[in-house]
Design a protein with these regions (language model features):
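Generic structural signal for well-ordered alpha-helices
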Residues: 2, 26-37, 59-64, 117, ...
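Internal alpha/beta core interface subdomains
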Residues: 1-16
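Glycine/Thr-rich beta-alpha phosphate-binding loop at enzyme active sites
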Residues: 12-25, 63, 67-68, 72-126
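Glycine-rich phosphate-binding active-site loops on the catalytic face of alpha/beta enzymes
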Residues: 12, 73-82, 135-136, 142-169
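C-terminal helical cap(s) of enzyme catalytic domains, especially alpha/beta-barrels
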Residues: 84-102, 146, 159-183
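Extended, intrinsically disordered, low-complexity segments
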Residues: 110, 172-197
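Catalytic cores of alpha/beta
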Residues: 54-69, 121-126, 136-153
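Short beta-strand/loop segments at the ligand-binding rim of alpha/beta enzyme cores
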Residues: 39-51, 120-132
Length: 197
């Protein structure tokens, strides 16, 4: 695939594939990364996509490995969540849907994703690349994720509900907020909201 991509993502966090999240655990992640290193002959930038529901010990271990291993470029934070906490405070027309299985994306994962981004930025002291995902539909959402430590952002749910025009809207608002807050470029914003790094 190397001629066709800028980077690859190893997804070890989809809640819809039974047992996949076990790859985030100590012991499993190390052997996976060893295999990735052997297979990545072209040295493509490689990211690991983690869960917003990840255990703190597993998160610390993954961060430690990412700093140590040259084969991993960074983390994609985060996949969908199995948590339904963000739904309980909302009035949902079909409340039975709260109990459905599968991962939630978009606004329901936003706060969890932001929390993990901030933790990873602190744990790695900003030494790895972070791609922020989850609940980005405005420039303000992107600004927040970047200020918590991510270097890049990805969108999906907002693209579905708002169409391709959402990209230019996000970029315009993000650019406005960066200038308004005294930054000359987006890289100056990375991790600015994170304390004690």
């Amino acid at each position: 695939i190397s001629p066709f991509v800028d980077y690859i993502t190893i997804n070890i966090s989809s809640p819809n594939t039974e047992g996949l999240r076990d790859l985030q655990k100590k012991g499993n992640i190390e052997s996976l990364l060893e295999t990735i290193t052997k297979c990545n002959k072209k040295k493509l930038p490689t990211f690991i996509k983690i869960s917003p529901d990840i255990d703190d010990n597993d998160l610390k271990n993954i961060c430690k490995i990412c700093i140590k291993e040259n084969s991993i470029s960074g983390l994609v934070i985060s996949n969908t969540t199995i948590s339904r906490e963000s739904l309980y405070s909302k009035q949902i027309r079909n409340s039975w849907k709260i109990d459905e299985k599968g991962g939630l994306s978009g606004p329901p994962v936003k706060n969890l994703s932001n929390m993990i981004i901030e933790k990873v930025f602190k744990l790695t002291q900003g030494k790895i690349l972070i791609i922020g995902v989850g609940g980005i539909s405005t420039g303000k959402d992107a600004y927040e994720k970047i200020s918590l430590g991510c270097n890049l952002v990805q969108i999906y749910t907002s693209l579905i509900y708002r169409g391709p025009g959402v990209v230019s809207n996000i970029l315009s608002e993000l650019s406005f907020l960066i200038k308004k807050n005294g930054y000359s470029n987006v890289t100056q914003l990375v991790g600015k909201k994170v304390k004690n790094v």
